[in-house]
Amino acid sequence: IMKLDLYTERLHLRPLTEDDLDLALEMFTDERVMRYGGGASTPAEIKAQMPLVTRRSDGGCIGVWCVIDRTTQEKIGSAALTPMPIEENDTNWDLLLNDCIPLAEIEIGYFYKTSVWGKGIATEAASRLLQFAFEDSPLDVVVACFEPENHASKNVLKKIGLRYESTRFAYGEIDAVYAITKQQWLDQQESG
């Protein structure tokens, strides 16, 4: 069985469930959190999305995790490995069906409460998720895309080893796309 509970020094990542609506409402109604994530949503929209965003595929490897502070047990954010949309404005959750690997490129993504910004949390969680992707899942490549002015996200991706690949269409707009292969990741682990 795939072990989907992931731990770091400060964090516990576990699969997002519908019981995490409280976290979703706090983050996704916040314009600051959603500045580069398509803008804030209404509580009704978020509630309607919960059954979709809690889907997983490929035996659980692909999906969204809830990020929890191990000291306080507070839910502080979400991190995900999900199919990257090209034409659509949002993830196509219909691609997440448990027994298959989505054919789309798999991207790493994350959202955090503003209260934990600037503490290295996003980097710590993303680094662990990348390790999971290449050690425990069948993925050979992980990509990420972001609006070019989202410097904080770019810095996280560079810290965990992703490199600029191209500027191209994703989420229905022109985004910068970063990528890392399993071999590149393994080489980085060896070089420390």
Can you describe what each PLM-predicted range is?
Residues 1-36, 64-192:
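Acyl-donor (CoA/ACP) binding surface of acyl/acetyltransferases
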Residues 32-53, 63-65:
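Conserved GNAT-fold acetyl-CoA-binding loop/helix
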Residues 56-60:
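Short loop/turn motifs at secondary-structure junctions and domain boundaries
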